[in-house]
């Protein structure tokens, strides 16, 4: 990398975040500019509409880049194979925790009887977000996708829903670790979600090296965070010259081995 690029990178890091939303600007050699946004996939009513300045950035961009286009009507969990009875797949303690949280969320445990373990975890997480007042239509990436379509802006997927489902289907023990982490860190997850909401409603992190609670086991973190960050880094590095608004989950922007660090 040339000296000018290194100086620009250092200057950007020293300035910190000067936006009213969680974002980090990255410039790569070859005149490629990325505005990385820490998205929340479900948001509150107060998180709409998006900041005018952010919409202007999107208008001036060559494309919007997202993890997956969530604006389509496709159901990602359709046609999944049924699993054996839940009692045969998890421990008695895990089953009791699941039943307790299901009751707390107003969900019938019978809903989960033959679902994959990773799907149960995701349903629980989505229901928890709904209980906190969040809805998919107020999610940051969903709002950006709607704005991009109104502006006739190209949309590029880093993964796509099909690849995300394929990744989940390949989790060890059919996603047992994801369910166990969801049950174990249930209240921590709620606080983390509220913290990420505050980045949009109040003020974003001013220090890109903030420490976040670890709610993943190491093996799961490697699959869901580290390996995906590596793949996204390679895809972004392969982009042609231009300006891009990139929306990824907020946890991918901060903490150990985050996407901006990998790109620099």
Curated annotation (Swiss-Prot):
It comes from the Bacteria. This is Uncharacterized protein YbaP.
